[in-house]
Amino acid sequence: MKTMGITGGNGFIASLVKEAMQSTMEIIPLTRKELDLGETAAVRSWFNTHDYDYVFHTGAMAQTADCENHPELTHRINVDGTKEIAKACKEKNARLIFISTEQCFNGKTEEGPFTEDTPLCSVTAYGNHKAECEAFITSVLEDYIILRFSWMLGMSRPGIKASPNIIRNVMNAMFYQTPAKFTVNEIRGMTYAQKLADVFDKIIELPSGIYHVSDTNTHNTYESANIVAQKLGFTQEQIDACILPNHERYADRFRDYRLDTQKLKAHGIDFGTFEENVDACLKDFGWLK
């Protein structure tokens, strides 16, 4: 049985993938307790002294504010730690599966969707961290998978805590009758994370390269929030009272983060439309029949 180490081992994506893969692969989940990615010497030591066939590197400090306010710490975790893992994978002849992000394109002024070959342009520290990691991985390794994620959605359940996402945000607004604003100046993919976990066995065997993981979405974030609320059964009057358009955020420049996914589709992996992803999530958790 092959072995896969997973950094960020108790995170949302890591937990789903561990659950999906643990019957066919030995999984070594590495949480911050076992390995602090900010301690480069410890990262180097662990990956040089353990055996593994794959590393799924999900661990990172992904909050934009943290990256902007603590540039040295977050660079050490997000970039320096990744470089140590990549170098170890080369020595061990192990395949690195690295999570990157749509935020590598957040400085683009043209419309998406963007392909894997589109030049990167980020205006945030987090996006630049991921771009720097991508450049290092592609220059050092021959055997790697870089997955640029859209915004991943889902819901929490015992043992797995979902990351903040549009479904949770809409539910909080509607069920607690707490009005929330959603920007009209942004369009992005929003993909049900379980769909990724369900095909992860295929993803880790893809040819080496960069791949975009995203649904297809033609709605801005405010429109997307409306769709979620409608699927939850609320009337438009109820929705209009709690799902509010935010015209101020990104008023300087419309953000288009959409990712072109034709490359993955050519390998038989298709994450479908935004509506299909929301339906799948709500059905899995009993909110839709």
Where are these regions (language model features)?
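Adenosine-cofactor binding site in Rossmann-like domains, unifying the SAM/SAH pocket
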Residues: E26-S45
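NAD(P)H-binding glycine-rich loop region in Rossmannoid oxidoreductase-like domains
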Residues: T40-I77, A88-K90
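Catalytic helix-loop patch of NAD(P)-dependent Rossmann-fold dehydrogenases
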Residues: R76, G81-E84, C104-L147, M152-L153, ...
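N-terminal Rossmann NAD(P)H-binding glycine-rich loop of SDR-like oxidoreductase domains
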Residues: K2-M21
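NAD(P)-dependent short-chain dehydrogenase/reductase
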Residues: T138-R188
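Alpha-helical substrate-binding/gating segment
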Residues: I167-A180, E186-D215
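Mid/C-terminal beta-alpha module of Rossmann-like enzyme folds, strongest
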Residues: V199, I203-Y250, K289
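Conserved C-terminal active-site "lid" loop/helix of NAD(P)H-dependent oxidoreductases
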Residues: N220-N226, I243-C281, F285-K289
